[in-house]
Swiss-Prot record:
Source species of the chain: Homo sapiens
Keywords: Coiled coil, DNA damage, DNA repair, Nucleus
Name this protein carries in UniProt: DNA repair protein SWI5 homolog
InterPro entries recorded: DNA-repair_Swi5 (IPR010760)
Localization: Nucleus
Gene3D superfamilies: 1.20.5.170
Biological processes per GO annotation: cellular response to ionizing radiation; double-strand break repair via homologous recombination
Length: 235
């Protein structure tokens, strides 16, 4: 029964194939060959050729495992500068009037070709060539130089004013010295008093430093330590 069922299934498939693509009746002289050629020309055959790969790559996918593409952040475009674009356009209109000798040849990056640039070298630099040449010279003061006669007059006037101020200061010091002498003070006594004041200030600075360190160690303020040593806040 099983063989009979297989035979019926095979006959059914064969009849279906004949119905889809009927075969013309056989004729003498090999008349069926054109039909075979027509079928071969219509049908497309795909040949799959397997090339044995290395042993360590068998059973793996032929394409390498790549990481998934990360989503790209949208590019942030800066503010537009229409003023710069207009300036470049106006400069491009003026450039054709310039001579071709001023337009140098600039090498393109990553290539051995020399391409003639659209702008002169002065356009590439921030300062004009005239300014760079002037900078190479000696330093010039921004103040205008006075004339010879005017300079002599002003210098003499300024010298007279300085001399007058020094004389007034000397007279003032002489008056103070004469006043101290009249009160009974002497120059040696005044110098001794000044040296004692300097020594007092030095000792006071050292004492304040020691009081501050002691206050930090005890965790109190220096104001609380003054009565302990018999000192006043005015000292």
């Amino acid at each position: 029964m099983q063989r009979r069922g297989q035979r019926d299934l095979w006959r059914h498939n064969k009849s279906c194939a004949r119905n889809r693509c009927p075969r013309p009746p056989r004729e003498r002289g090999g008349a069926g060959f054109p039909w075979v050629r027509a079928q071969l020309s219509v049908r497309q055959f795909t040949l799959r050729v397997r090339v044995p790969g290395p042993v360590h790559l068998r059973g793996r996918s032929p394409t390498p495992a790549l990481d998934p593409l990360a989503p790209l952040n949208p590019l942030i475009r800066g503010p537009r500068t229409p003023g710069l674009r207009r300036w470049i356009q106006s400069l491009a209109l003026l450039l054709p009037n310039c001579s071709s000798s001023r337009i140098p040849t600039v090498p393109r990056p990553h290539s051995g070709l020399w391409v003639q640039s659209d702008f002169p070298l002065g356009f590439l630099s921030r300062t004009e060539p005239r300014l760079t040449r002037s900078c190479r010279g000696a330093f010039r003061s921004p103040r205008p130089l006075p004339k010879s006669g005017q300079a002599d007059g002003t210098s003499e006037e300024s010298l007279h004013l300085d001399i007058q101020k020094l004389k007034e200061k000397r007279d003032m010091l002489d008056k103070e010295i004469s006043q101290f002498v009249s009160e009974g003070y002497s120059v040696d006594e005044l110098e001794d008093h000044i040296t004692q004041l300097h020594e007092y200030n030095d000792i006071k600075d050292v004492g304040q430093m020691l009081m501050g360190k002691l206050a930090v160690i005890r965790g109190v303020t220096t104001k609380e330590l003054y009565p302990e040593f018999g000192l006043d806040m005015n000292d």
